[in-house]
Swiss-Prot record:
Assigned protein family: Belongs to the G-protein coupled receptor 1 family.
Protein's name in the database: Olfactory receptor 4S1
Organism, scientific name: Homo sapiens
MF terms (GO), sorted A to Z: G protein-coupled receptor activity; olfactory receptor activity
Functional summary from the UniProt entry: Odorant receptor.
Gene Ontology CC annotation, any one: plasma membrane
Disulfide bonds: 95-187
Organism taxonomic ancestry: Eukaryota, Metazoa, Chordata, Craniata, Vertebrata
Pfam family, one: 7tm_4
UniProt topological domain (Extracellular) ranges: 1-23, 78-98, 157-193, 257-267
Cytoplasmic side: 48-55, 119-137, 218-233, 288-309
Positions annotated with a glycan in the UniProt record: 6
Annotated PROSITE patterns: G_PROTEIN_RECEP_F1_1 (PS00237), G_PROTEIN_RECEP_F1_2 (PS50262)
Entry keyword Disulfide bond: yes
PANTHER family: OLFACTORY RECEPTOR
């Protein structure tokens, strides 16, 4: 297979051909990416700096924030840089690295959200045993398993793609290297590979979605026997998580579970999935969480007092 591969680089089409639109993309996505990195860094620093945010929920939130920094960083900086050049070139090795990284951090994000749903289930449905069940060891295992599962998902996607023969053309109708556009360029029958790719990505998204739905149905049924104050806190916490789950899971479910056709909106859906959840997650989890907001205020007060000295 490898001997037939005479493609050393790929040409990315990007989002728009118009130079004016590309300049607009540069401004918008540069701003979005800076806000994403700063917002998630602020969440990580706040959680690690305040002793009041040491519960498992905030441990998983810091893990999610780290994944949310890394996920768009695999594609957006390259896309921003490409707005300055006419020919958007990426090497074969660079393409495979981008493919692996995007699926690694994107997959890990989904598994972390599943771990967070389990944490909320234990906290609400088994409150008396919560600290015993969700100890440091269990949290570390769940987080480690999420990152390992993301790695296994990504390495399968990458190995399936890298072993394909690419004889030309080498033009990818996308703004980054993803599996489906690359399968169309391979000079071999990719039917079985395509099925495995769909099963790998689509079923992970679908299975995670159903696990999360079942978890929250059980949580809602459990809330009926609790006080109105406990219900309010649980709905506030779980509501943030549900919004994030929908933002993260709906685009890949649409992309991989529907029949394999090319839609003009596909690139925009992928872009939404890469850019918007990492950008919005810090807002979603902080605006609805008084503990995080208070911790951030105290952190800024400490910074201000140190600056005055």
């Amino acid at each position: 297979m490898g001997a037939k591969n005479n493609v050393t680089e790929f040409v990315l089409f990007g989002l728009f051909e118009s130079r004016e639109m590309q300049h607009t993309c540069f401004v918008v996505f540069f701003l979005f990416h800076v806000l994403t990195v700063l917002g998630n860094l602020l969440v990580i620093i706040t959680i690690n700096a305040r002793k009041t945010l040491k519960s498992p929920m905030y441990f998983f939130l810091s893990q999610l924030s780290f994944a949310d920094i890394c996920y768009p960083s695999t594609t957006i900086p390259k896309m921003i840089a490409d707005t300055f050049v006419e020919h958007k070139i990426i090497s074969f090795n660079g393409c495979m690295t981008q493919l692996f990284s995007a699926h690694f951090f994107g997959g890990t994000e989904i598994f972390l959200l599943t771990a967070m749903a389990y944490d909320r289930y234990v906290a609400i449905c088994r409150p008396l045993h919560y600290t015993a069940i969700m100890d440091c060891r269990k949290c570390g295992l769940l987080a480690g398993a999420s990152w390992l599962a993301g790695f296994l998902h990504s390495i399968l996607q990458t190995l399936l793609t890298v072993q394909l023969p690419f004889c030309g053309p080498n033009e990818i109708d996308n703004f980054f290297c993803d599996v489906h556009p690359l399968l169309k360029l391979a000079c071999a029958d990719t039917y079985m590979v395509g099925l495995i790719v769909v099963a790998n990505s689509g079923m992970i998204s679908l299975a995670s979605f159903f696990i999360l739905i079942i978890s929250y149905v059980i949580i809602l049924l459990n809330l009926r026997s609790q006080s109105s104050e406990d219900r309010r806190k649980a709905v506030s916490t779980c509501g943030s998580h549900v919004i994030t789950v929908l933002l993260v899971l709906m685009p890949p479910m649409f992309m991989y579970i529907r029949p394999s056709t090319t839609l003009a909106a596909d690139k925009l859906i992928i872009l939404f999935n890469i850019v918007m959840p990492p950008l919005l997650n810090p807002l979603i989890y902080t605006l609805r969480n008084n503990d995080v907001k208070n911790a951030m205020r105290k952190l800024f007060r400490v910074k201000r007092s140190l600056g005055e000295k």
